[in-house]
Amino acid sequence: DPKKLSSMGDFLLYFLNQVRDDYDYIIIDTQPTRDSQILSNAIAAADYVLIPMQCDAFSEDSAFRTYSICSKLSKDPASRLKGIGVVLTMVDKGAATRETREECKSELGSALFEAEIPMALAVKSSVRKCVPVCYSARTQPVGRSYAALYEELKERLDKLEEN
């Protein structure tokens, strides 16, 4: 009974459980903020978390903080959370990106996805047109990068589901 739920996280989980069997995956996309109740509730209700991280110091700090929260939560026996990953976005060929990538590899290990999303004007254009990048720029490097991310994500999810 939804009236007996004690928190918004429980409320979200209750409604997700009502439709969970109807879908292979339910994706909750939240804004990337440090102290968002929406983000906290989404993580609490999630089976898996993918953390996109822009290659800058502020985003790195936020991503590491979110990753840490998720790691702690995944160790709680009451948690549904089974997998966590981080994907680098807005990647360019600059020194700052290389430095960020190396720090992420060192801190995150296998949680860091191999697939990366490059910085591209096609992404802004896609957002403006309300069309997914994988359709609007499918032959461009950024479109192929999103396809590679999907394949890697699917592979990781399949492995986690087997266990």
Language-model segment annotations:
Residues 20-21, 25-115:
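Conserved catalytic-core segment of NTP-binding enzymes
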Residues 75-163:
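C-terminal lobe/tail of nucleotide-utilizing enzymes
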Residues 11, 65, 145-148:
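Charged catalytic carboxylate motif
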Residues 2-9, 56-60, 139:
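Flexible, glycine- and charge-enriched loops at secondary-structure boundaries
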Residues 10-11, 25, 31, 152:
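Bulky hydrophobic/aromatic packing residues
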Residues 1-24, 128:
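P-loop/Walker-type NTP enzyme "switch/lid" segment
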